[in-house]
Amino acid sequence: VSTALISVDLDRTMIYSSAALGFPLDASVTCVEMYDGGPLSYMSVRSTELLQKLASEAVVVPTTTRTVEQFDRIDLPGAPWRYAITTNGGNILVDGVPDASWRASFDDVDLPAVQQELAARADGDWVLKRRTADDLFCYLVVEPDAVPVGFMDDWSQWCAARGWNVSQQGRKIYSMPDVVSKSRAVAEVHARAVDDGSLRPESITLAAGDGALDADMLLAADHAIRPAHGELEALNFRPPGLTVTTATGGRAGEEILDWFFGRIAEHREP
């Protein structure tokens, strides 16, 4: 029975593109995701070993804004996962299968109305792609430097009045229902893991993530850490008690894993 539940964001927290990794693709690096026949995401070999070990000592819950399909592309060390969270909390995977009852709780989300309004507002050359994620939320892939001045503020205002929120991570602008959040899904997984006997009721919760969509998850955890890069770094997100890595890129991923082991050791029974 584990004494810690660890929810960990993936992209730019645990796994990295070659550009975001920050060090050469040599023998110390391993590919963990292929896409369209080519390598897409990497981890250092040390990170893969640490994550594998961590998954044997705690209830580790991969927690991502990726869709189920996008998550399934990743060959993440530590699998198979009893629980994983995708679609920013919109799906909980139990032994790899989306839980229908959890997904049904979001059936009232009015995605078409938001898509229609967004299509009218975001119609310039700066929009490269429009995507929906598991019929729960939508996002734009944009040229960041070409986004019109005021678009983010105006769109955020429109969404906020309707129970939605807007955030930008690199080239992606997400429009997300407030009810779809990582922290809500993590709380549900925590309850289920206690119920199924894999987690002690008094267990600590640990979390790591780099984006604005991770903020609620970091705030809800007993202890949380973020890398010194990414959207939260740009926002200077530093609430009391949050640890920030000294390293950036893939080395921050290693530092986060080391930190998890440190927190587990502190809370282990004497």
Q: Where do the protein language model's features map onto the residues?
A:
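Active-site neighborhood of HAD-like aspartate-dependent phosphohydrolases
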Residues: 1-62, 72
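A general structural motif
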Residues: 1-3, 57, 81, 135, ...
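Proline-centered loop/turn at the N-terminus of a beta-strand
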Residues: 5, 59-60, 83, 165, ...
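A metal-dependent, Asp-based hydrolase signature
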Residues: 12, 16-32, 79-92, 110-117, ...
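Short glycine-/acidic-enriched loop or helix-start segments at secondary-structure transitions
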Residues: 17-18, 71-74, 95-96, 216-217, ...
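Active-site phosphate-binding/coordination module
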Residues: 41-124
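Conserved acidic, metal-coordinating active-site core of Asp-based
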Residues: 117-220
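Mg2+-dependent phosphoryl-transfer enzymes with acidic/Ser/Thr/Gly-rich catalytic loops
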Residues: 183-270
